[in-house]
UniProtKB/Swiss-Prot annotation:
It is found in: Secreted. Homooligomer or heterooligomer (probably pentamer) with neuronal pentraxin receptor (NPTXR). This is Neuronal pentraxin-2. It comes from Homo sapiens (Human). Gene3D superfamilies: 2.60.120.200.
Amino acid sequence: MLALLAASVALAVAAGAQDSPAPGSRFVCTALPPEAVHAGCPLPAMPMQGGAQSPEEELRAAVLQLRETVVQQKETLGAQREAIRELTGKLARCEGLAGGKARGAGATGKDTMGDLPRDPGHVVEQLSRSLQTLKDRLESLEHQLRANVSNAGLPGDFREVLQQRLGELERQLLRKVAELEDEKSLLHNETSAHRQKTESTLNALLQRVTELERGNSAFKSPDAFKVSLPLRTNYLYGKIKKTLPELYAFTICLWLRSSASPGIGTPFSYAVPGQANEIVLIEWGNNPIELLINDKVAQLPLFVSDGKWHHICVTWTTRDGMWEAFQDGEKLGTGENLAPWHPIKPGGVLILGQEQDTVGGRFDATQAFVGELSQFNIWDRVLRAQEIVNIANCSTNMPGNIIPWVDNNVDVFGGASKWPVETCEERLLDL
């Protein structure tokens, strides 16, 4: 535009210089296209109007008008460029959201940001087309975005598939939880059954132990059992339930097998209030076997610490304190003045395997019997020698008339136990 204006001004000045018009002549300035400048075509004379402006003023006014037009066009171009930049930014964002699809289409389209034509009308038209193109592309991208959201093959379907997958996982989880609950219930039932079985077994064992301790176990016959005292302690012992009446004579017989040496300990003891050693048979340390009556002592010539079964009998009478000692049916010793004229006091406690320091208690482990006892019988008279022989050689089974050896009359404590005993003949073979 500025070049066109300069050409017009130069043409007018040249014409004025050549023609040298007379004073008062007028010139008209007309905008010509670029090709008319070089053609050299003369311009028609324009009639002059009275009172018109001078050529300089008209030229100045035209220049100002053209300048204003240029400024307006610059402002329009600036506004259009700003709009283009804004739309281009939106387009870039939309193309980014569309995953690059619109960018591919835009790359093959026309470049709307190239050099602009110099004609203002063309510029405006070109800008309008560019804006329309940008709007169309923006609408296309928005349409694609809406299609992406609503299209059944993309996110919506993915969301549905995800929901289905989550539902399937939830059902699997519920099934697994149900299986775990079933396994837990089954395990609880098995545990309960196992616990009940264990408790039943323990109860049976406890009942068996109780029966053994109380002597309620069944043997071939009531006297076919033995008491086992395997350790030298102060808590393993047997107890005769019945007590003794007042006695002026007695015979005590038993079978024993000692497992300790030296000293078999105390096979039995009878204590009454005021006298813990009313009747005691004991072998302590390297001392010989002793019979105590009312704490009076008689040494017996018996030897039973070889670990074999032996049949032992002792007799006593208050008359002159006479006593006898038999081993395996043979009389090995006799004596007198053992607590003469002293009756055996009634109501005491008869213990197997321990020596009593008080009635029924205060046992001393060093005096405990270790081994097995059986056929412990007490009579209230002195048995004849032949009777003792017959008992010892298994010819006669004669229970004591005061204390018989029967299962329900013997309790065991502290780990002592009752077991079936060997037959009398088997014990004889062990002599």
